[in-house]
Amino acid sequence: MPAQPNPEVLVISASHGENLALAERFAEAARQQGAEAAVLDLTSVELPLFTSRLQGAAAPEALAGLQSQLAGSPRWVICAAEYNGSIPPVLTSAIAWLSVQGSDFRALFNERPVVIATYSGGGGHTVLTALRLQLAHLGAQVVGRQLVSNRSHPASDDSIADLLILLLR
């Protein structure tokens, strides 16, 4: 589903299913706090897997739209499942594509406030640690608190609201 242009909070889902549902909850909670919010489902963006062989090739058509959506939203929430103890390939590949296009990809990340969250069948802490490291390396300001949820510990509305309060400061 395409995100609306320039929402105050862009909630990015790096997997479908439970993390997309979590992303929708974040977007609704942001709206309840008076912020414009939209959900970007990365699994619906038609980007090929980034490889070094493609680096010199023309950028995929969908990349410009993705870059525009990300640049147009001052705050992000990223909801990502844990894949083999790390970041979902769709998110890693999107970041790689963004990093090789344009002259200053770091401007997309520098000082951008970001909340990270997961619904994971496993622990979920490993993906958030990996994501925090990567986003901090790129210059993002990752909110200190994060949200870990799973079947036995679902995300509470209060936790989502509290994270958004921190993000919207």
Where on the chain are the PLM-derived regions?
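Cofactor-binding loop segments of dinucleotide-utilizing enzymes, especially the Rossmann-like FAD-
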Residues: 14-16, 42, 119-121
